[in-house]
């Protein structure tokens, strides 16, 4: 019972502390909001006077599009080569089974040797 009372007291104290932080944070946010309204007005004025360099933007977009086309061509070529290699791949299942059994035997011997 004593531990329950202590735990309950700590929980109430924690909730009170968190509520105080929330009130302080809310007040700080409202102060910042007033400052942000001024900053937003400055941003609006700066945006009105902003004139983008459309030629540079078009050139950058064209260059990115060309790079994308080159990547597509290169990827499709490699994808086709991979498809052909996969179709011609014929695994030797007997050798794979034999290797797996050999590894399993080696693993069993290692377990015995190291008492695993």
From Swiss-Prot:
The keyword Cell inner membrane does not apply. A motif (Processing quadruplet motif 2) lies at residues 80-83. The modification Pyrrolidone carboxylic acid is found at residue 84. Keywords: Pyrrolidone carboxylic acid, Secreted, Signal, Toxin. InterPro entries: Latarcin_precursor (IPR018802). A motif (Processing quadruplet motif 1) lies at residues 41-44. It is found in: Secreted. Disulfide bonds: none annotated. Expressed by the venom gland. One of its GO terms (cellular component) is extracellular region. It comes from the Eukaryota. Cleavage of the propeptide depends on the processing quadruplet motif (XXXR, with at least one of X being E). Pfam families: Latarcin (PF10279). GO terms for molecular function: toxin activity. Residues 1-22 form the signal peptide. Residues 23-44, 80-83 form a propeptide. Belongs to the cationic peptide 03 (latarcin) family. 06 subfamily. The mature peptides (45-79 and 84-116) probably form alpha-helices which disrupt target cell membranes. This is M-zodatoxin-Lt6a/b. It comes from Lachesana tarabaevi.
